[in-house]
Structure formats: C-alpha cells, structure tokens
Curated annotation (Swiss-Prot):
It comes from Mycobacterium leprae (strain TN). Coiled coil: none annotated. Its EC number is 2.5.1.141. The chain crosses the membrane at residues 20-40, 53-73, 102-122, 124-144, 149-169, 170-190, 227-249, 254-276, 288-308. One of its GO terms (biological process) is heme O biosynthetic process. This is Protoheme IX farnesyltransferase. The lineage of its organism: Bacteria, Bacillati, Actinomycetota, Actinomycetes, Mycobacteriales. It is found in: Cell membrane. Belongs to the UbiA prenyltransferase family. Protoheme IX farnesyltransferase subfamily. InterPro entries: Protohaem_IX_farnesylTrfase, UbiA_prenyltransferase, UbiA_sf. The gene is ctaB. GO terms for cellular component: plasma membrane. It is a multi-pass membrane protein. Keywords: Cell membrane, Heme biosynthesis, Membrane, Transferase, Transmembrane, Transmembrane helix. Carbon 2 of the heme B porphyrin ring is defined according to the Fischer nomenclature.
Length: 308
C-alpha cells in the first residue's frame, strides 16, 4: 500500500512539473534573454552607471512580464501554424498541453501585471511603453504582418527594440536620443538575425504558408539583404558612440567588423554556389549583440568620459 501511494504521489508530481513547464514554455524564456541583454545597459547608460539597483530590478520584472505576456499571446495566435512546422511542433499549444483559454488568461495577467508594476515602481511612461510593446507585437506583427508580407520581421521587429526604451524611460521618465540610437541598433540587427535562422528552416515556413523572406526569395537575394542590414547595424552602433566612452567605441568597431565579415562570407558563399551555414550567423549574431551591449554596460559603469 505504501509503495503504491508513493508511486501515485510521484506520478502527480511529474504531471504537475510537466504542466508548470508547459506554461513556462508559453512565455518563451530564451527570447526574453534579449530584454536582459539590452535593458540593463540602457539603464546604466541613462544614469552613467549609478542607477538604483532596486529600480533596475523592478524595471526588469515589469519588462519580463510584458515580454512573457506578448510571447504567450503569440503562441495562441500561431498555434495553427506551429503544428505544421517541425521547429515549433512541440510548443505547448501545438501539442495541446495547455488549453488556449488558459493561455489567453495567462497572457492578459502578465500584460496587465507588467503595466501596473512598472507604473507603480518606475513611472507611467514605462508602463505605457510596455503596454504598447505587447499590443504592437500581437496585433501588428503576429496578426497583421507575419502571414502577409516577407518584410514581416523588418517592421514587426520593432517590438524587440522596446526594452531599451523602457529601460531608458524608467530612469529618465523621457525618451532621449541615445534610447533611439539603441532602438536603431536592435531594429537593424533583427532582420539578419531572424533571416539567418529562417534560411535553415525555410521549408517549415513554406509548409505553414508563412512568407518569411527565405521561403519566398532566392538565397542570393536573402543574403544580400542580410548583408545590407548588417552594415546598417554596425553603422548604427557608431552613432551611439556619441554618448559613450572609448571602451564602447573600440568594442563596437571590432565586433562590427567581425559581424560584417560573417555576413560577407555568407553572401559570397551563396553567390559562389558553395554550401553555407546560415545557422552559424544566427548564433553568432546573438553573441555580437551581447558583446556590444555588455561593452556599453561596462563603459557606463566606469563612467568613462564621452568621446564627443
């Protein structure tokens, strides 16, 4: 009897753990990492490294909640196509691990919680920016652009740029030009980052009838666009140097040259008809963004004198 009872409790524990992990997966934790990588340096730059740690923590909690809410809504809206794509077929709603209604409630709770938390702990502007981010990601990108245009990630990617705006506004209660410069960096970085991954999974997008650029254009055209946006990314990091010290400037130049080299190699390889590995660019683009923004954070904490 005791053994049977222990097994019953063990099964219930596993089911509970599986259910919790399914709800957590709805929020796409790995996507939220971008928030941490970009929001903290933005806040440090806004206060030249002397930002209140509690304010940073409160802003991150609100921002994470907003991102989690947006990702949850995205899973609900994309459940039909997630079932068709190998890369996303194991997502909770695609495999019916979570009822859609429960996912909607979770998304609403996270979004509302984010707004009120940021309003209470930082300022109204930050709360409104978080609310606008969720609305833009869900209604403009997910519902309007994603299934209608190959430029979906170009314009829809603006939602991923908002953490720096929220971080900056949490410190200053304004939107200054450095925040816009950081916004531009992430805006131009998003297409090459996303298209490199989409090149690897373009057949998935074709099956799901999602007009991601690699699924509807030639590899030559896609890699040319990747190269153009990589150049724009590297150049936009130099604009931010007007508000930073020599450390950020040096890292931005070196990292930009490295990122451009990888994009050029991908384009040249495709033009030459050689086998290419776009997934490598996707993975390294994450490292590039992390390096640039970490350099920004260190530069700000050290309060190095601005170059201009």
């Amino acid at each position: 009897m005791r053994s049977r009872g222990v097994k019953y409790v063990s099964v219930r524990a596993r089911l509970a753990r599986s259910r919790v992990l399914a709800y957590l997966a709805l929020t796409k934790p790995r996507v939220i990492e971008l928030l941490l990588v970009t929001a903290i340096p933005a806040m440090l730059l806004a206060d030249r490294g002397s930002a209140n740690p509690l304010l940073i923590l409160n802003t991150l909690l609100g921002g994470i909640s907003a991102a989690a809410g947006a990702n949850t809504f995205n899973c609900v809206a994309d459940a039909d196509i997630d079932k068709l794509m190998k890369r996303t077929s194991r997502r909770p709603l695609a495999r019916a691990a979570v009822p859609p209604r429960n996912a909607l409630v979770l998304g609403l709770a996270l979004t509302a919680g984010s707004f009120f938390w940021l309003w209470w702990t930082t300022n109204l502007l930050s709360g409104l920016l978080a609310l606008a981010t969720v609305a833009f990601y869900v209604f403009v990108y997910t519902l309007l652009l994603k299934r209608r245009t190959s430029q979906n990630v170009v314009w829809g990617g603006a939602a991923g740029c908002m953490p720096v705006m929220i971080g900056w506004s949490a410190i200053t209660d304004t939107i200054g030009w450095p925040a816009l410069a950081m916004f531009a960096i992430i805006f131009f970085w998003t297409p090459p980052h996303t298209w490199a991954l989409a090149m690897r999974y373009k057949d998935d997008y074709k099956v799901a009838s999602v007009p991601m650029l690699p699924a509807v254009a030639t590899e030559r055209h896609v890699t040319k666009q990747i190269l153009i946006y990589t150049w724009l990314t590297a150049l936009s990091t130099l604009v931010l140097a007007l508000a930073t010290g020599w450390l950020y400037m040096a890292v931005a130049v070196v990292a930009g040259a490295w990122f451009l080299t990888m994009a050029h190699q991908l384009y040249v390889g495709v033009c030459a008809g050689e086998p290419v590995k776009p997934l490598r660019l996707f993975l390294q683009s994450n490292n590039y963004l992390a390096v640039v923004f970490c350099a920004l954070a260190v530069d700000s904490v050290l309060a190095l004198p601005t170059l201009f």
